């Protein structure tokens, strides 16, 4: 069986962090428990909040056989623009 790799970006600002995931993957792997309103969306990307939604997504994709590689992007001195995106619904 060929190993599947999923490359994701994790964005942080001084107060919080979000894992950027394509909406199609969220819909596929987070079926049993819906995403909370603490996550955001912009276009076809969902920004899963770090405390609850992101860990559940990572657990689901790892359980499906993916190896996950995460690139960290940090905004240490100002709020991330993600905070202005639409809340997930």
Regions found by a protein language model. Name each.
Residues 4-6, 42, 70:
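Sparse, context-dependent recognition of short Cys/His-centered cofactor- or disulfide-binding micro-motifs
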Residues 4-36:
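N-terminal acidic leader/helix
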Residues 31-39, 65-72:
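Short secondary-structure junctions
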Residues 36, 41-50:
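A short, exposed loop/beta-hairpin motif centered on an aromatic-Gly-Thr core
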Residues 49-89:
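Short, compact, well-ordered microdomains
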């Amino acid at each position: 069986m060929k190993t599947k790799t999923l490359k994701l970006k994790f964005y942080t600002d001084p107060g919080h962090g979000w894992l950027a995931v394509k909406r199609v993957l969220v819909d596929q792997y987070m079926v049993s428990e819906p995403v909370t309103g603490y996550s955001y969306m912009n276009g076809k990307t969902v920004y899963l909040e770090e405390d609850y939604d992101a860990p559940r997504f990572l657990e689901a994709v790892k359980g499906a056989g993916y190896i996950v590689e995460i690139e960290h992007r940090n905004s240490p001195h100002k709020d991330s623009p993600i905070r202005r995106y639409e809340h997930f619904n």
